[in-house]
Every structure is written in structure tokens, then in C-alpha cells.
């Protein structure tokens, strides 16, 4: 299996179905990869220096496709999503595009169906199934990604999370900024053990102010 490719980004394009592709030249061979919108934006225009892309090769009876990601964790999460009943490659990449790595893991682990439904093509039943099938797996996977052993970040409950998101959105922060802040402050022991929304809000605002 191809784990990653390293080469020159030649072109970045969007097709009529709003899917993003890039051509990566590796030792004289041009590889076409479908990539998330965020990576396409990052490499538009194509950077002059060689780039590394983590890949997932999809082989089906009627299709062979290569998907590319800027982060190894994104590639691994894509593979996890593909194992869920009813989640194909396009819906998996849409989930990553819409919620981002941290936001998607957080939504699944906390069972935040409302947040998962923000992704086009994901309904309530699909979101519930996604959370049900992946909650335990992603909790364990998240611990490994964080590189910790016995201790790890603890994500807020769904109700607390909704209060936190609404407050930060009202203060003008974007969904991406909010997801990043929650992922970071959830690693602070005093915050992780608290069920007080004010504690989470104060820490999140503090982190956002410094970044």
C-alpha cells in the first residue's frame, strides 16, 4: 500500500462536482489525488518546493482512486470513516472538510449529532450511526494520536459543548477556531475535570487570545 508520496505539486483543480484534485509529479510520474478543500487552498498556487502527501488508495471493481491528505492523522481518520456503514469516500472527505480533524473527532466522541449534521449529506440517523460505530474506536485512536498513556484530554459533554460553542460564536470566533481551542484546552487537567461552562469558556478565550 502507498503510505505517502513526495513530489512537486503541478496543478490544483476543482471539477464540476466541487471535488478538489491535484497532480503530484513524483520521479517523472504524475499522480492524480483527490484532496480536502483545505489542502487545495493551502497549495494554491502550487508551492515551488516539493510536498509530502499522505495517501489512501481506494480499489473497487469499477474504480481506482487515490486520496491525499496533508496530515497523517487526517488520512487515518478517513480510513476509519470509510469503515462505517453507509459512509463512502466522498462523504468521508466531506466530513473532514466540514468539521476538520479535531472537530470531527470531538463530535463523534461526545455524540454531538447536531454538529455532525452540519456536513452536507449527513442526516440525523447517519450521524447517530456514525457516533455509535466510531465513538469507542476514535476515543482510543485520539489517545494514541495525542501520544499519551494513562492520561489524556477529556472532551466536554454535549450540553456543555453546545453552551461553549454558542458563547464563542457570539464573540465572533469561527467554528474552526472554536474546535481548535476546545481540543487544546481539554488537555488541561483542571479544565477537563470541570463541568462549569465558565471554566471552559475562560480557558478557551485565553487560548484563542494567544493564538
Curated annotation (Swiss-Prot):
Alphabetic keyword roster: Cytoplasm, DNA damage, DNA recombination, DNA repair, DNA-binding
Region (Domain I) location: 1-70
InterPro entries the UniProt entry points to: DNA_helicase_Holl-junc_RuvA_I, Hlx-hairpin-Hlx_DNA-bd_motif, NA-bd_OB-fold, RuvA, RuvA_2-like, RuvA_C
Cellular location(s): Cytoplasm
Segments for region (Domain III): 158-211
Record's miscellaneous remark: This bacterium is considerably more resistant to UV and gamma irradiation than E.coli; the E.coli-like SOS regulon model is not an appropriate model for DNA repair in this cyanobacterium.
Protein family: Belongs to the RuvA family.
Subunit field text: Homotetramer. Forms an RuvA(8)-RuvB(12)-Holliday junction (HJ) complex. HJ DNA is sandwiched between 2 RuvA tetramers; dsDNA enters through RuvA and exits via RuvB. An RuvB hexamer assembles on each DNA strand where it exits the tetramer. Each RuvB hexamer is contacted by two RuvA subunits (via domain III) on 2 adjacent RuvB subunits; this complex drives branch migration. In the full resolvosome a probable DNA-RuvA(4)-RuvB(12)-RuvC(2) complex forms which resolves the HJ.
Protein purpose: The RuvA-RuvB-RuvC complex processes Holliday junction (HJ) DNA during genetic recombination and DNA repair, while the RuvA-RuvB complex plays an important role in the rescue of blocked DNA replication forks via replication fork reversal (RFR). RuvA specifically binds to HJ cruciform DNA, conferring on it an open structure. The RuvB hexamer acts as an ATP-dependent pump, pulling dsDNA into and through the RuvAB complex. HJ branch migration allows RuvC to scan DNA until it finds its consensus sequence, where it cleaves and resolves the cruciform DNA.
Protein name (record): Holliday junction branch migration complex subunit RuvA
Species of origin: Synechocystis sp. (strain ATCC 27184 / PCC 6803 / Kazusa)
Lineage of source species: Bacteria, Bacillati, Cyanobacteriota, Cyanophyceae, Synechococcales
Amino acid at each position: 500500500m502507498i503510505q505517502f508520496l513526495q513530489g512537486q505539486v503541478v496543478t490544483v483543480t476543482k471539477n464540476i462536482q466541487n471535488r478538489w484534485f491535484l497532480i503530484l509529479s513524483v520521479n517523472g510520474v504524475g499522480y492524480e489525488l483527490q484532496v480536502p478543500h483545505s489542502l487545495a487552498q493551502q497549495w494554491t498556487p502550487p508551492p515551488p518546493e516539493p510536498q509530502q502527501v499522505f495517501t489512501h488508495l481506494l480499489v473497487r471493481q469499477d474504480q481506482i482512486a487515490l486520496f491525499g491528505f496533508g496530515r497523517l492523522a487526517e488520512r487515518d481518520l478517513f480510513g476509519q470513516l470509510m469503515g462505517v456503514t453507509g459512509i463512502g469516500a466522498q462523504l468521508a472527505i466531506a466530513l473532514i472538510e466540514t468539521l476538520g480533524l479535531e472537530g470531527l473527532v470531538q463530535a463523534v466522541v461526545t455524540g454531538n449529532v447536531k454538529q455532525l449534521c452540519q456536513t452536507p449529506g449527513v442526516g440525523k440517523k447517519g450521524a447517530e450511526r456514525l457516533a455509535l460505530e466510531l465513538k469507542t474506536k476514535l476515543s482510543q485512536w485520539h489517545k494514541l494520536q495525542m501520544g499519551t498513556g494513562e492520561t489524556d484530554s477529556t472532551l466536554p459533554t454535549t450540553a456543555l459543548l453546545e453552551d461553549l460553542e454558542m458563547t464563542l460564536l457570539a464573540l465572533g470566533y469561527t467554528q474552526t477556531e472554536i474546535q481548535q481551542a476546545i481540543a487544546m484546552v481539554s488537555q488541561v487537567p483542571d479544565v477537563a475535570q470541570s463541568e462549569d461552562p465558565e471554566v471552559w469558556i475562560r480557558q478557551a478565550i485565553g487560548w484563542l487570545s494567544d493564538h
